Amino acid sequence: MTFRPLHDRILVRRIEAEEKTAGGIIIPDTAKEKPQEGEVIAIGPGARDESGKLTPLDVKAGDRILFGKWSGTEIKLNGEDLLIMKESDVMGVIEQTATVKKAA
């Protein structure tokens, strides 16, 4: 089954956080917070402005995003837990930058 978001909605898969702290302490499931980072799976066509013109979304499928703790609606699709949210719930896109090694 496929899912196509409408308007300015996006479909997001949460990216699970680390299960250990930097000091090596394992965090139990009961103490974990929901991750606020995810990967965009699908996007809608965009929102319409006052004149009726379609405004495309800034995010695209494959983007890694940050969103609020209580953003979106949780759904289960093909046995996978996903989120549907409006683009306005997205705080920003995480861009992967290539690390540049400096010569010593």
Curated annotation (Swiss-Prot):
Any one Gene Ontology cellular component term annotated for this protein: cytoplasm
Entry keyword Transit peptide: no
Gene Ontology BP term (one): chaperone cofactor-dependent protein refolding
Xref: PROSITE patterns: CHAPERONINS_CPN10
Keyword vocabulary terms for this entry: Chaperone, Cytoplasm
Family assignment from sequence similarity: Belongs to the GroES chaperonin family.
Name of the protein: Co-chaperonin GroES 2
